[in-house]
A protein has these predicted regions:
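Short, internal strand/loop/helix patches
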Residues: 7, 75-123
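Thiol-/selenol-based redox modules, centered on thioredoxin-like
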Residues: 107, 111-159
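N-terminal "domain-start" segment that seeds a small globular fold
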Residues: 1-19, 104
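Conserved helix-turn-beta segment immediately C-terminal to the redox Cys motif
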Residues: 24-25, 34, 39-62, 81-85
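Amphipathic alpha-helical repeat scaffolds
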Residues: 10, 30-34
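Preference for well-ordered, secondary-structure-rich cores of eukaryotic proteins
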Residues: 10-13, 85, 147
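Thiol-based oxidoreductase modules, predominantly thioredoxin-like and allied folds used
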Residues: 55-73, 88-99
Length: 159
């Protein structure tokens, strides 16, 4: 199995096969609009703008499991991201990343790259770098800023 074998609902509620991103380097992030890390949206958008023409995308998966910091509807989330951070990278419908109802995409990501203290996602803005073949190559903690990931993205784009 690879990342591209899964699907998820895009922010408009329509199913989207992740195979649509095959051949791209991806940064997959669980996001929230009312979190101390929310300003990372700017850095994520900057990475997307810088590298999208080279085969890179950021995929945002809003999640309300951590401190109820993503209470809005999918439409409200999209409006917030666009208005405040100019986000135009793909956003998906709100999901759960941990527990019995964790989305299959996140079950896969966590099984491929566990964290320091087990597989569970600990907070918003945990990031996974996925290579062009759909393999999870790195997992980053929430406090790792998008700017610090640029070098790893460059390496994957050059492979």
């Amino acid at each position: 199995m690879s990342f591209y074998d899964y699907s998820a609902n895009s922010n408009d509620g329509k199913p989207k096969k992740l195979s649509a991103f095959k051949g791209k380097v991806l940064l997959v992030v669980n996001t929230a609009s009312q979190c101390g890390f929310t300003p990372q949206y700017k850095g994520l958008q900057d990475l997307y703008a810088k590298y999208k023409d080279r085969g890179f995308a950021v995929l945002g998966f809003p999640c309300d499991q951590f401190g109820h910091q993503e209470p809005g509807s999918d439409d409200e989330i999209a409006t917030f991201c666009e208005t405040n951070y100019g986000v135009d990278f793909p956003l998906f419908s709100k999901i759960e990343v941990n527990g019995d109802n964790a989305h299959p995409v996140y079950k896969f990501l966590k099984s491929e790259k566990g964290g320091l203290l087990g597989d569970a996602i600990k907070w918003n803005f945990t990031k996974f770098l996925v290579d062009k073949q759909g393999n999870v190559v790195e997992r980053y903690a929430p406090m790792t800023t998008p700017e610090r990931i640029a070098g790893d993205i460059e390496k994957e784009l050059e492979r």
